[in-house]
Amino acid sequence: MKIGVFDSGVGGFSVLKSLLKAQLFDEIIYYGDSARVPYGTKDPTTIKQFGLEALDFFKPHQIKLLIVACNTASALALEEMQKHSKIPVVGVIEPSILAIKRQVKDKNAPILVLGTKATIQSNAYDNALKQQGYLNVSHLATSLFVPLIEESILEGELLETCMRYYFTPLEILPEVVILGCTHFPLIAQKIEGYFMEHFALSTPPLLIHSGDAIVEYLQQNYALKKNACAFPKVEFHASGDVVWLEKQAKEWLKL
């Protein structure tokens, strides 16, 4: 089965990595809109337009399913993309919410949503969590993580300063942290380590990873089986420098 994966840049690699590990598909077309990253600082109308343009990009590739591996686009453009598509278009928010529903039984557990400014302002996660009965939800726009990750700054003083800036003011320590941007799993270990060290936690918070969540969602909703395709083919495209994107993919995905 041939599918597409769409993201604003390299953040979708976290989803792609999970898909490749699960071996669900034999061919994956990855499109990163790297010329216009980040999406998280742009207005909803612009993001919807970017989503529709991504649909146009994938049409000649004759894919059977499109994964929107971008939380901002999933929050603001998914519905519009689904209206204009003849194939299934799947976002990353619903799978993440269902993963929480499976793993977090305490409806009063403190949940922290990390995301871009646009994702947080959309209230997509907050509303979906409240519909599932979760009452103790807070959110934090951590948009500065995106350009750092796009520049491959995955550790060191800059990232530490950024985490300190965002996390020091937290008044309630979360038991669950939603990595509400597909860039963020690329620094998940650093986020977990920061919480453990600076808040003296005995156990780390549960991190909800879009990539892992969407693999389980696809298996349940599209009758897909793990390890069905041992050697999936991956093809990379970008609105910006595709050579740079491929280089990042080789480094991060070990292709």
Curated annotation (Swiss-Prot):
It holds the Pfam family Asp_Glu_race. The active site is at residues 70, 181. Keywords: Cell shape, Cell wall biogenesis/degradation, Isomerase, Peptidoglycan synthesis. GO terms for molecular function: glutamate racemase activity. It is an enzyme of class 5 (isomerase). Substrate binds at residues 7-8, 39-40, 71-72, 182-183. GO terms for biological process: cell wall organization; peptidoglycan biosynthetic process; regulation of cell shape. InterPro entries: Asp/Glu/hydantoin_racemase, Asp/Glu_race, Asp/Glu_racemase_AS_1, Asp/Glu_racemase_AS_2, Glu_race. Pathway: Cell wall biogenesis; peptidoglycan biosynthesis. SUPFAM superfamilies: Aspartate/glutamate racemase (SSF53681). The keyword Cell wall biogenesis/degradation applies. Its EC number is 5.1.1.3. It catalyses: L-glutamate = D-glutamate. PROSITE patterns: ASP_GLU_RACEMASE_1, ASP_GLU_RACEMASE_2. PANTHER family: GLUTAMATE RACEMASE (PTHR21198:SF2). Provides the (R)-glutamate required for cell wall biosynthesis. Belongs to the aspartate/glutamate racemases family. This is Glutamate racemase. It comes from Helicobacter pylori (strain ATCC 700392 / 26695) (Campylobacter pylori).
